[in-house]
Amino acid sequence: MRILQLSDPHLVAADAALVRERPAMTLLDRALLEGQRSHPDLVLISGDLCQDESWGGYVRLGRLLDRHVNVPVGLLPGNHDDPLLLKAVLGRRFCTAPAELIVQGTRLVLLNSHRSGCSAGWLGPHQLQWLQERLADPLRRDLPLVVALHHPPVAIGHPVMDTMNLSDHHQLAAILQPHAALRAVVFGHIHQHWHGTWPQRPDVPLLGCPSTLRSFQCVQPCPLGRAEDPGGRLLEIHNDGSLSHQVLRWSPC
């Protein structure tokens, strides 16, 4: 089962508008087109979907997804999002966090780390309790598990981004680390490739995703040597339950 992860498109209501000096809509359109070459079974966009948190921005996101994608879609809110508006506009057609998806025997749990008025992330006690109850389901607990959220669940070594990661990351780690079926935790927010682990679970990769819009100063070298290009990530759960992953990059024009 293949998951195409894209992140941080920062769309706005105006089709041709520049965001951070780049054409956000055109770049996400390109990312979806390039990503389909990998033949994913699910598309995940891990937050900061709509820079201006507008109805029009989410409508345009839906149109792009309808144009390019014919597999299940998971959408995560980031700090540059309005989770309620996202759900109102796109929640009937696509899966919005918090939610659980099972695709071809793989379990994907989507978390909402948005906290109103704050750049840092927060899951909160109610969502953490929901997560704990979901993971305890005896009928599903042995399925390969991928957990996705917008904010990094660990410090990545970046002086700015580490001030706005997930504030309740210790509570999340305490819930996730005991689960033998956990294969990966994936996130956005940092606009760059990043690969780390928890010391307690060195077998579980913690994976940051490049942005479809533009990159921030990188902590780790890009495996493809293209740190400035838009990109994404492809994850594959194999028939034996093992996971492989790779960074994807493409030209911005």
From Swiss-Prot:
Claim: Ligase is one of the keywords in the record: no
Binding residues for AMP: H10, D48, N79, H80, H191
Residues at which Fe cation 2 binds: D48, N79, H150, H189
S-S bridge residues: none
Cofactor names: Fe(2+)
Record-listed E.C. numbers: 3.1.4.-
Keyword vocabulary terms for this entry: Hydrolase, Iron, Metal-binding, Nucleotide-binding
Family: Belongs to the cyclic nucleotide phosphodiesterase class-III family.
Name of the protein described by the UniProt record: Probable cyclic nucleotide phosphodiesterase SYNW0868
Gene designation per UniProt: icc
